[in-house]
């Protein structure tokens, strides 16, 4: 019998294969649709401070979303790795300050103002897949799980 970790790993492989099979055009349309729907939710409209991941590789291109958050006058914070397995929200006012950090993921400089978790109204996190009940399947590193668990 497979362990839960083995089942999750197998599911991640299947989902990754699907993502890799997408054409560039399909990916662009999918990215736009996700961003369109996110920015039309009541949660987004009400949010004053938004924590959002910076997509890379197989993940959606979140740069248009990050630009929209700033254009809408919202306070933006993105992941900032502050230690092994520890991630906080670093405030960003200008996307040009983002530089490759841990694992090559663009993040703000270490001296960026840290946003208190209590101030974050909406979190937009990567998701490899989700259950019908809304349980998120991440990429396996646990950074976002640990971050979200502290809310």
Which residues does each PLM region occupy?
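N-terminal active-site beta-alpha-beta segment that forms phosphate/nucleotide-binding
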Residues: 2-119
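Generic detector of intrinsically disordered, low-complexity, polar/charged segments
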Residues: 82, 101, 126, 135-139
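Short loop segments at secondary-structure junctions
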Residues: 93-95, 128, 151
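Mid-sequence acidic-hydrophobic segments that form the walls
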Residues: 108-112, 126, 150
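Well-ordered alpha/beta subsegment
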Residues: 114-120, 125, 129-134
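Membrane-associated lipid acylation/remodeling enzymes share a hydrophobic transmembrane-juxtamembrane segment
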Residues: 133-151
């Amino acid at each position: 019998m497979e362990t839960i970790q083995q089942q999750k790993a197998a599911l991640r492989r299947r989902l990754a294969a699907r993502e890799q099979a997408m054409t560039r055009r399909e990916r662009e349309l999918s990215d736009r649709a996700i961003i369109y729907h996110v920015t039309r939710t009541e949660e987004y409209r009400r949010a004053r401070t938004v924590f959002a991941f910076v997509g890379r590789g197989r993940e959606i291109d979140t740069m248009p979303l990050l630009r929209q958050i700033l254009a809408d006058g919202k306070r933006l914070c993105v992941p900032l790795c502050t230690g092994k397995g520890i991630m906080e929200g670093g405030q960003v006012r200008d996307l040009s300050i983002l530089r490759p950090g841990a694992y090559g993921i663009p993040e703000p400089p270490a001296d960026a103002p840290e946003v208190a978790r209590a101030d974050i109204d909406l979190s937009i996190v990567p998701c490899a897949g989700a259950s019908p009940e809304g349980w998120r399947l991440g990429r396996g590193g646990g950074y976002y799980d640990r971050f979200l668990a502290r809310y």
